[in-house]
């Protein structure tokens, strides 16, 4: 019976330890509730009393402004990565954080510039906010479709109220609001073509529970470029890549969470309601009649499609337009049929598809593995197929969007050919 008494002692000790842990958690939660006092704070904006907002202390300045109807852009979802939620605090600014120091110059910091996503509201503040952010609004959209257009990319199509059209420009983006949610990735098969199942099964991506029911609303927004152009309203489209954890032994690392916003979007089904806000953006078309070259990879397809369709189908532009699109294989290519149709219809539009890792089935269909302009990294194919033949590369406009490595490779290449940064429009917040 000695072993039984020993087992009993272990059980009692374990139970006591667990109970102590639960008690400590309860004490911490109660302490936060009763000891951390929430008090009203006034945000005086642009020295205009009519714009003064009263908010609760303790939240980020970004969240407080959003709750007050002032839609400061935060494409990265409040992670201090995009550096776009800049606000100047003209009175009562706290000491800058490291994220502020890495964003602003010493003079700007002294002037009160801060990242609103990192600044906590603890007392009254006086702010300067750009007037354009007062024009941003929110819309409720209904999911029309949410199908995979590549293994890890969905095309989310929403319908908004036609009596309230969203006044966006091609190259712009909207922020998608993510409510608390819980999903099982196996349910995503409902909006996924079976051709994509095998890759998901190889990496054990199905039957994964993603629980964000206790979501922190301060970080529950993310911006996505619009794949649609204004003439397609009341429909709006996005291309969204799922942010999986890193893979360990061909399975997602269980210690690292899935992307909050992309997982929410992948869980959406026709009929679901989605809140979007905006519009925002700076990567618009420069109307100077220079020929335009689009260098697009992956989910950057949103950015390219919006501009190209607007130029050709809406503005009937006669500018020379060239699209270089990079994908791993034909299965990962997006909007190929649409672009091939446009190329036949518009003599000023040229479409080049480049595959970095064509599948055997692609080769069986006739894809030329040995052609370096068709099978290559996109930046190398572009250099061989067009850039090296341009007499004056600096006379062109370059619109760039894709994964981080794609973007950096393109920027380095263009710099080597003497292209000024002012001739490059880069959309990289989603990288």
UniProtKB/Swiss-Prot annotation:
EC number: 7.2.1.1
Domain of life: Bacteria
Gene3D superfamilies: 3.10.20.30, Nucleotide-binding domain of ferredoxin-NADP reductase (FNR) module, Translation factors
Localization per record: Cell inner membrane
Annotated [2Fe-2S] cluster binding sites: 76, 82, 85, 117
Primary role: NQR complex catalyzes the reduction of ubiquinone-1 to ubiquinol by two successive reactions, coupled with the transport of Na(+) ions from the cytoplasm to the periplasm. The first step is catalyzed by NqrF, which accepts electrons from NADH and reduces ubiquinone-1 to ubisemiquinone by a one-electron transfer pathway.
Protein name: Na(+)-translocating NADH-quinone reductase subunit F
Organism placement in taxonomy: Bacteria, Pseudomonadati, Chlamydiota, Chlamydiia, Chlamydiales
This protein's encoding gene: nqrF
């Amino acid at each position: 019976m000695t072993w039984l008494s020993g087992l009993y002692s272990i059980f009692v000790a374990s139970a006591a330890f667990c109970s102590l842990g639960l008690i400590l958690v309860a004490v911490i939660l109660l302490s936060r509730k009763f000891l951390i006092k929430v008090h009203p704070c006034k945000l005086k904006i642009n020295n205009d009393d009519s714009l003064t907002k009263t908010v609760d202390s303790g939240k980020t300045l970004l969240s407080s402004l959003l709750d007050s109807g002032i839609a400061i852009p935060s494409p990265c979802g409040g992670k201090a990565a995009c550096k776009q939620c800049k606000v100047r605090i003209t009175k009562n600014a706290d000491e800058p954080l490291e994220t502020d120091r890495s964003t602003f110059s010493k003079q700007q910091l002294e002037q009160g510039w801060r990242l609103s996503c990192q600044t906590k509201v603890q007392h009254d503040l006086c702010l300067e906010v750009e007037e354009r952010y007062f024009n941003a609004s929110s819309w409720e959209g209904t999911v029309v479709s949410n199908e995979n257009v590549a293994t890890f990319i969905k095309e989310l199509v929403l319908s908004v109220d036609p009596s309230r059209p969203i006044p966006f420009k091609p190259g712009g983006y909207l922020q998608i609001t993510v409510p608390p949610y819980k999903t099982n990735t196996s349910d995503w098969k409902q909006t996924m073509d079976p051709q994509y199942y095998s890759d998901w099964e190889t990496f054990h991506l199905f039957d994964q529970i993603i629980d964000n029911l206790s979501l922190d609303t301060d970080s529950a927004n993310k911006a996505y470029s619009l794949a649609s152009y204004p003439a397609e309203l009341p429909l709006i489209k996005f291309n969204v890549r799922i942010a999986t954890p890193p893979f360990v032994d061909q399975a997602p690392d269980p210690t690292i969470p899935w992307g909050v916003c992309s997982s929410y979007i992948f869980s959406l089904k026709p009929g679901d309601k989605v809140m979007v806000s905006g519009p925002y953006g700076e990567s618009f078309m420069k109307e100077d009649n220079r020929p335009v070259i689009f260098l697009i990879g992956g989910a950057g397809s949103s950015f390219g499609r919006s501009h190209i369709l607007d130029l050709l189908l809406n503005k009937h532009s006669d500018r020379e337009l060239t699209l270089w699109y990079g994908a791993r294989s034909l299965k990962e290519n997006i909007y190929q049929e649409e672009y091939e149709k446009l190329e036949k219809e518009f003599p000023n539009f040229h479409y080049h598809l480049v595959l970095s890792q064509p599948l055997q089935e692609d080769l069986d269909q006739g894809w030329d593995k040995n052609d370096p302009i068709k099978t290559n990294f996109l930046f190398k194919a572009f250099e061989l197929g067009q850039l090296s033949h341009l007499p004056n590369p600096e006379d062109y406009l370059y619109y760039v969007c894709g994964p981080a490595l794609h973007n950096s490779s393109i920027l380095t290449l263009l710099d080597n050919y003497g292209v000024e940064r002012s001739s490059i429009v880069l959309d990289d917040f989603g990288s």
